[in-house]
Amino acid sequence: MSLSLWQQCLARLQDELPATEFSMWIRPLQAELSDNTLALYAPNRFVLDWVRDKYLNNINGLLTSFCGADAPQLRFEVGTKPVTQTPQAAVTSNVAAPAQVAQTQPQRAAPSTRSGWDNVPAPAEPTYRSNVNVKHTFDNFVEGKSNQLARAAARQVADNPGGAYNPLFLYGGTGLGKTHLLHAVGNGIMARKPNAKVVYMHSERFVQDMVKALQNNAIEEFKRYYRSVDALLIDDIQFFANKERSQEEFFHTFNALLEGNQQIILTSDRYPKEINGVEDRLKSRFGWGLTVAIEPPELETRVAILMKKADENDIRLPGEVAFFIAKRLRSNVRELEGALNRVIANANFTGRAITIDFVREALRDLLALQEKLVTIDNIQKTVAEYYKIKVADLLSKRRSRSVARPRQMAMALAKELTNHSLPEIGDAFGGRDHTTVLHACRKIEQLREESHDIKEDFSNLIRTLSS
């Protein structure tokens, strides 16, 4: 049986699975074929359990299709292949990751002799600053479809820092949970290795520290400090834009950390290649590991966030009230939590029960602003401008894809962002019936799962209309 069997499986899995799934779960696996048993080695227990739960049938099916009755048995283990293998016998999953999800690293200098996470030394400097907020953990991060992959990737990094996903780059709009995940990773690493040097900071703090070091003729101390950490977590990396000296220093810090198997996690409000004012060599490096988007939370996740927040405050929030708020406030988690805090404060001050009518009163200015900002007319104008067509095209009977797809997108956005019924939405789109609107909504939902471009279009339009 050929040792190229796993490579054949990888090629098929890469074709069959969404790009993000393949990059996150399949690519890190290593394989060893021996005595009619194919052993798959996962970097940690989390990956092992996920692969066995989600992809066991896929892999077994491929083995059977390639080998028939002679298909090897599968065995899963945590760790790496035995080092006694010859290079020719090693079978690893070095299939190039799709560019829009993650890019494998170009050849770099050989890593230092530092072995990484089995021998983390005690902190050397008493002035070392972690800045990790202990309140932000994976346990109190509300997971939904919009952030599931980002949370899973962050969890893997916390369990195996300096491993497969280095750097990890999280991007998305304001208030979607990027900072929460940074702190959760920091807490996860320090729970596993209490002596680990984990530093969280905003990108502007890095710039300020560098300026002070230059002013005090202490740039070497600055370099030693940042290059000695075990994990560097930097928020809002887009603020490095047009700061040439800071980018130069971070470039060398980035290289030093990766060569030492030290973890880097970065966040931004946009995809790495879309960050203006940042050098191409840095943007390229941002994509060396894994890049994951965090989307605005869908309705069910917004409701879960409100219910969890209310529970943390010992407040009984009726389900219908949570749905009422979640249906009307859609842009980000911070806005949701702020609205709920306002409702709770009003209830405490007045002693009234939290009902839908009470929420309407407590949030009347906020709800009025939302309804004013997001109308079907506004959605139609925004979608037409985005796709470079005319609003009249959206209302017409034209069925060409260049018009039909934007029309479906606009209908789906109208259902998501307004409180209009399906018949009302249909009337606003040239007198179409409610079944046409329903079909459009289902079609866009399907395409968001299948097409990276449609998913990005939907997220961009939601962000524009909700801001």
Swiss-Prot record:
**One biological process GO term for this chain?**
positive regulation of DNA-templated DNA replication initiation
Modulation of this protein's activity: Inactivated in part by the RIDA complex (regulatory inactivation of DnaA), composed of ATP-DnaA, Hda and the DNA-loaded beta sliding clamp (dnaN), which rapidly hydrolyzes ATP-DnaA to ADP-DnaA in a DNA-dependent fashion, preventing reinitiation of DNA replication. DnaA inactivation by RIDA is further stimulated by DNA synthesis. Also inactivated by IHF in combination with the datA locus, which promotes ATP hydrolysis of ATP-DnaA, called DDAH (datA-dependent DnaA-ATP hydrolysis).
Q: What outcome follows a substitution of V211A?
A: Does not initiate replication at oriC at 42 degrees Celsius, does not unwind oriC, forms active ATP-DnaA-oriC complex, does not bind ssDNA, can load DnaB helicase, ATP- and DNA-binding are wild type
Catalytic reaction list: ATP + H2O = ADP + phosphate + H(+)
Name the principal localization, coarsely classed: cytoplasm
Q: How is it modified after translation?
A: Acetylated at Lys-178 by PatZ. Deacetylated by CobB. Is also acetylated nonenzymatically by acetyl-phosphate. Acetylation levels increase in a growth phase-dependent manner and peak in stationnary phase.
Report residue spans for region: Domain IV, binds dsDNA. Answer: 348-467
> How the protein is affected by changing R334A?
ATP-DnaA is no longer hydrolyzed by datA-IHF
Keyword presence, Nucleotide-binding: yes
Please name the top-level EC class of this enzyme: hydrolase
Query: In which residues is ATP bound?
Result: G175, G177, K178, T179
Q: What is the effect of changing R245A?
A: Does not initiate replication at oriC at 30 degrees Celsius, does not unwind oriC, forms active ATP-DnaA-oriC complex, does not bind ssDNA, can load DnaB helicase, ATP- and DNA-binding are wild type
Phenotype when changing W6A: Unable to initiate replication from oriC or oriV, no self-oligomerization, binds DNA normally, no change in ATPase or ATP affinity, cannot load DnaB helicase
Residue stretches of biased makeup (Low complexity): 98-111
Region of interest: Domain I, interacts with DnaA modulators: 1-90
Q: Which residues form a coiled coil?
A: none
Which CDD domains does the record associate with it?
AAA (cd00009), Bac_DnaA_C (cd06571)
Write out the similarity annotation: Belongs to the DnaA family.
Its domain comment says: Domain I is involved in oligomerization and binding regulators, domain II is flexibile and of varying length in different bacteria, domain III forms the AAA+ region, while domain IV binds dsDNA. Binds to the inner membrane via domain III (residues 117-378). Binds dsDNA via domain IV. Inserts into acidic phosopholipid-containing membranes via resides 309-399 which plays a role in rejuventation of ATP-DnaA.
Q: Which PANTHER family match?
A: CHROMOSOMAL REPLICATION INITIATOR PROTEIN DNAA (PTHR30050:SF2)
Per the entry, what this protein does is: Plays an essential in the initiation and regulation of chromosomal replication. Binds in an ATP-dependent fashion to the origin of replication (oriC) to initiate formation of the DNA replication initiation complex once per cell cycle. Binds the DnaA box (consensus sequence 5'-TTATC[CA]A[CA]A-3') and separates the double-stranded (ds)DNA. Forms a right-handed helical filament on oriC DNA; dsDNA binds to the exterior of the filament while single-stranded (ss)DNA is stabiized in the filament's interior.
**Additional detail:** At least 4 systems specifically target DnaA to prevent more than 1 round of replication initiation per cell cycle. 1: SeqA binds to and sequesters hemimethylated oriC, preventing DnaA binding. 2: ATP-DnaA binds to the chromosomal datA locus, hydrolyzing ATP-DnaA in the presence of IHF. 3: ATP-DnaA binds to its own promoter, repressing transcription. 4: RIDA (regulatory inactivation of DnaA) via Hda and the DNA-loaded beta clamp (dnaN) hydrolyzes ATP-DnaA to ADP-DnaA.
What is the designated name of this protein? Chromosomal replication initiator protein DnaA
